[in-house]
């Protein structure tokens, strides 16, 4: 359901907490866009933040942990069971952050993202059961901060993946991807989502242009995502439409 993710747009919003913010929060900001250089660093960050959130943690620690669990599930998990645990732990951490700071758009984003990925990994029926929760979080994030670029990737992929009878809409998916790209043209996950949508609507030449732009991008917002997710997916999609017009 997702093609996402993060980059500079994912600034961890400071929220009032009883404890001091862990220095690991700042490190997450760096590693989240360079994890391809040393994926094992995600293990250490996960473990360190798990220790930091014991007791009465700072909301920023919980948000950082939710983010790391999501990336870890995508990149480090070796089995479906490990992925499910990672996304579940991520949404639990984000839920705790929301309890402390209900207007923290970043906390809500990671709650929605982990929830959506958990449902997707669990299977179609579970994913659809969680759909209202994800949709409500998207609406809330857009109300809180319409400049939160990553939420447009999440929203676009939800509109793209969900059946039309349940709210899926390729036109709205395209609109969400374009809105995100207007804010950050180098957010390659958005461009991959746009390319997929254009393929599904039969606009092959336009899709090919967008997907080639992903491969040609020399300064992606998130280099790690571009390296391990967006570029490989763009190549696969381009191969899939080879010879089509």
Question: Where are these predicted regions, by residue range?
Answer:
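N-terminal leader/linker segments that initiate helical-solenoid repeat arrays
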Residues: 18-77
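"A position-specific structural signal for the A-helix of alpha-solenoid helical repeats
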Residues: 26-31, 64, 71, 110, ...
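Short coil/turn linking the two alpha-helices of tandem helical-hairpin repeats
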Residues: 31-39, 66, 71-80, 117-126, ...
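Structural signature of tandem alpha-helical TPR/SEL1-like repeats
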Residues: 39-43, 78-92, 125-137, 166-179, ...
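Conserved structural position within tetratricopeptide repeats
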Residues: 50-54, 92-99, 139-143, 175-182, ...
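Short coil turns that delineate tetratricopeptide repeat
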Residues: 56-57, 102, 146, 185
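TPR alpha-solenoid repeat register
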Residues: 59-61, 107, 151, 190, ...
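Terminal, low-structured helical/coil segments at or just beyond the last alpha-helical repeat
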Residues: 200, 206-245
């Amino acid at each position: 359901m997702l093609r996402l993710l993060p980059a500079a747009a994912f600034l961890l919003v400071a929220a009032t907490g009883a404890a001091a913010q862990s220095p690991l929060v700042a490190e997450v900001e760096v590693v989240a866009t360079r994890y391809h250089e040393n994926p094992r660093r995600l293990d250490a960050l996960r473990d360190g933040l798990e220790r930091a959130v014991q007791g009465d943690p700072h909301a920023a620690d919980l948000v950082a942990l939710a983010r790391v669990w999501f990336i870890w599930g995508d990149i480090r998990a070796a089995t479906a069971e490990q992925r499910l645990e990672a996304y579940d732990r991520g949404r639990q951490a984000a839920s705790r952050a929301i309890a402390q700071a209900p207007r923290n758009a970043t906390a809500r984003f990671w709650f929605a993202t982990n929830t959506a990925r958990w449902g997707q990994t669990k299977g179609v029926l579970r994913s659809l059961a969680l759909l209202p929760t994800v949709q409500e979080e998207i609406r809330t994030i857009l109300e809180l901060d319409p400049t939160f670029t990553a939420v447009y990737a999440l929203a676009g992929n939800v509109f793209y993946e969900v059946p039309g009878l349940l709210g899926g809409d390729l036109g709205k998916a395209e609109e969400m991807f374009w809105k995100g790209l207007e804010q950050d043209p180098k957010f390659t996950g958005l461009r991959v989502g746009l390319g997929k949508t254009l393929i599904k609507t039969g606009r092959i030449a336009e899709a090919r242009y967008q997907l080639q732009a992903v491969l040609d991008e020399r300064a992606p917002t998130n280099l790690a995502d571009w390296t391990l997710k967006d570029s490989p997916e763009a190549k696969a999609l381009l191969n899939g439409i080879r010879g089509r017009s």
